Regions:
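Extracytoplasmic/periplasmic beta-strand context in beta-sandwich domains
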Residues: 94, 286, 317-320
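Charged, low-complexity, helix-prone segments enriched in Lys/Glu/Asp/Gln
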Residues: 184-189, 323-329
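Extended hydrophobic-aromatic, low-complexity segments
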Residues: 217, 239-241, 315-316, 331-333
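P-loop NTPase "switch/coupling" elements that transmit nucleotide state to mechanical/effector output
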Residues: 1-90, 97-300, 307-309, 338-341
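Alpha-helical elements of the RecA-like P-loop NTPase motor core of helicases
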Residues: 141, 313-316
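Extended, charged alpha-helical "arm/stalk" segments used for dimerization and assembly
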Residues: 300-310, 319-320, 326
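Long, amphipathic alpha-helical segments that form or neighbor coiled-coils/leucine zippers used
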Residues: 316-321, 327-347
Length: 347
């Protein structure tokens, strides 16, 4: 909980059990420490996930239990996505980006990718490229090669959904990526609101493309391409709570619109999987959901990290986040290796 929440006399309404169960209590039932659990079980909400972390969990442990297992697949030509979802001020940017003292999932993932890559370099030649973009007010902008140009989403028959004109920087060490992360995050749109002093006003997407081919490949060779997308979503907002006016309110409305579109896609994918149906999924309702199309319903391994705020004033937002995360558990994707066949000409 934030200090300002404690100063207002707010209480924690969330408990973690056995590292995978989240219990959400109704604030009206939480009167003192003795009555936190079990007073009125009809109002308690319980959700089971693969892992549940409290506020004291080290960054490295979060990475190890959510993302580390994806790295080997990316190096072998499979797509993966990790995205942090939740209300504003719930710690999504800290989880994904972190800081110099406590790096988040983005940097820890890249360290692991380069570490595992070394074990394959005897018989493989790798190329690693990085891109970093933001979606701000439904406009896509490059966070590395900064300009006022708004980029377009395109449907590519081989790459799937991609961003036309987005820069991709070849990198050779995780430190290079960390420098790009810090630089790109400085270019990201951030403003203070009453709910969050460093509120991200955009969705940020870091993509790592890992290409490799066998060193002993002949005239005909295969290039395997794995793509890892690490996404820090802007947080859902309530105008009354954030105190937003003018441009901040417009930003908040666009953030909520894209998150609503994401929620609708999660709901439809959940329904399709539960009922074994193939109803239309409205991916085209926002730039965010178009970009996440493969991650949610296509050729990708995907991890959703739900960031929640445990204070009593955040009950509704926390409940909504947990419900979406619970539905997302039932979404199934179809993962396939990405192979590009190349024929070399001898002259």
């Amino acid at each position: 909980m934030w200090q300002k929440e404690e100063d207002k006399g707010e209480i924690s309404i969330v408990k973690i059990l056995d590292q995978n169960v989240v219990i959400l209590m109704d604030p009206a039932d939480v009167m003192n420490e003795e009555k936190v659990l079990g007073k009125n079980r009809t109002k308690e909400k319980q959700y089971a996930f693969d892992y549940a972390f409290d506020e004291d969990t080290p960054q490295q442990e979060v990475f190890k239990n959510t993302t580390k297992f994806l790295c080997e697949g990316v190096l072998n030509g499979y797509n993966s996505t990790v995205f942090a979802y939740g209300q504003t001020g719930a710690g999504k940017t800290y989880t994904m980006l972190g800081n110099e003292q406590n790096p988040g999932i983005m940097f820890n993932t890249m360290k692991e990718v380069f570490k595992q890559m070394k074990t394959h370099q005897v018989d493989r030649k790798y190329t690693i490229r990085v891109s970093f973009l933001e979606i701000y007010n439904e406009n896509i902008k490059d966070l590395i090669m900064v300009s006022n140009e708004v980029l377009d989403l395109r449907e590519d028959p081989i790459k799937g959904v991609c961003v036309a004109g987005l820069s991709e920087i070849e990198v050779h060490t995780p430190d290079e990526i960390f420098e790009l992360l810090i630089y790109g995050n400085r270019n990201r749109t951030q403003e203070a609101t009453e709910a969050n002093q460093t509120s991200s006003r955009s969705h940020a997407v870091l993509q790592i493309i890992c290409e490799y081919k066998e060193k002993d490949a002949g005239i005909k060779s295969e290039i395997k391409i794995g793509k890892l997308s690490l996404i820090d979503l802007a947080g859902s907002e309530r105008a009354a709570k954030t105190g937003n006016r003018g441009l901040r309110m417009i930003e908040g409305a666009n953030i909520n619109k894209s998150l609503l579109a994401l929620g609708n896609c999660i709901n439809m994918l959940h329904e399709n999987n539960i009922k074994n149906q193939s109803n239309y999924i409205p991916f085209r309702d926002s730039k965010l959901t178009r970009l996440l199309k493969d991650s949610l319903g296509g050729n990708c391994r995907t991890v959703m990290i739900a960031n929640i705020a445990p204070s009593s004033s955040n009950y509704e937002d926390t409940h909504n986040t947990l419900k979406y995360a619970n539905r997302a558990k039932n979404i199934k994707t179809n993962v396939q290796r990405n192979v590009l066949n190349v024929e070399h000409h001898i002259s």
